[in-house]
């Protein structure tokens, strides 16, 4: 019984020591954004203004 307990204790000790010696996980860096995401955004307001124009108010009568 004592040898079984000592073997188990030795095994647990070795597992604990080996876990402490393992290197920490490497944190991966985020990849750079895609090229299209880095381009300047289009001026959609100007495009809408050229399509939609303010018309005269129609008279109801």
Swiss-Prot record:
It comes from the Viruses. The gene is Rz1. Keywords: Cytolysis, Host cell lysis by virus, Host cell outer membrane, Host membrane, Lipoprotein, Membrane, Signal, Viral release from host cell. It holds the Pfam family Rz1. One of its GO terms (biological process) is viral release from host cell by cytolysis. GO terms for cellular component: host cell plasma membrane; membrane. Component of the spanin complex that disrupts the host outer membrane and participates in cell lysis during virus exit. The spanin complex conducts the final step in host lysis by disrupting the outer membrane after holin and endolysin action have permeabilized the inner membrane and degraded the host peptidoglycans. Host outer membrane disruption is possibly due to local fusion between the inner and outer membrane performed by the spanin complex. Residues 1-28 form the signal peptide. Interacts (via C-terminus) with the spanin inner membrane subunit (via C-terminus). Part of the spanin complex which spans the entire periplasmic space. The spanin complex is composed of spanin inner membrane subunit and spanin outer membrane subunit. Coiled coil: none annotated. It is found in: Host cell outer membrane. Residues 29-61 are periplasmic. Belongs to the caudovirales o-spanin family. This is Probable spanin, outer lipoprotein subunit. It is a lipid-anchor. It comes from Salmonella phage P22.
């Amino acid at each position: 019984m004592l040898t079984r307990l000592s073997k188990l204790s030795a095994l647990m000790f070795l597992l604990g020591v080996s876990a402490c010696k393992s290197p920490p996980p490497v944190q991966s860096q985020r990849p750079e954004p895609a090229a299209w995401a880095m381009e300047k955004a289009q001026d959609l307001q100007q495009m809408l203004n050229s399509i939609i124009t303010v018309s005269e108010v129609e008279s109801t009568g």
